[in-house]
Amino acid sequence: NVSTTTIFRMVKKLNYKSFIDFRYDLLYHRRDKYEFVNRGENVCDALENEIKDTISMLRNIDISGAIEKIVNARSVLICTSGMNKYVANILAVKLSLFGIRTIYPDDNWFLYLEANNLTPKDFVIVISRGGETKDIVDVMKIAKMNGCEILLISEKINSSMSKLSDYILNVAVSKDEGYDIDSRLHMHLAIEYILRELVNQHLYNKRYL
């Protein structure tokens, strides 16, 4: 395995401002190798099928315990990486609007620092497609050592992250194929599910709503 630090150093040496810039440039230069396949399926039909897969999984999940922890936590730390950061940012903003103290460091180093300050009174939410990102796994280990409970949102059922989690919210598997970069649709559905459960179970009685 190659560490995230090594990858960032390589990206900087290649004069890219960020890994995202490097990835976009790589995709552009390899564009001729990608095949555009006509799936013969209406776009709305395709979206509907994908959404149904995740909704069917969410129907069989009970996260009432996690919702209780989120509401009563001293603070909620959100951990993620890559494209999932956009989803995590939405979750962080909405939790804050609900009056829940939310910590969302955009930098891995600050994420480590925040994890070391966690106590059993805090709660952690992790968003990861594959559940194996080393930096996030390390942060989760620190959180567990500090007595925190963790909610994982992931596509993969069995992973290093799932073994460290107290609550797991699985979503349907998506694919990246050439230009068809995954939009994190399933992750968006998952956080919307969490937010609505928060409202339904607890927040209607709060004065700020």
What is each PLM-predicted segment?
Residues 40-98:
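Helix-turn-helix/homeodomain-like alpha-helical modules used for DNA recognition
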Residues 205-209:
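Short, flexible loop/turn segments with low-complexity composition
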Residues 72-204:
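Glycine-rich phosphate-binding loops that contact phosphosugars or nucleotide phosphates
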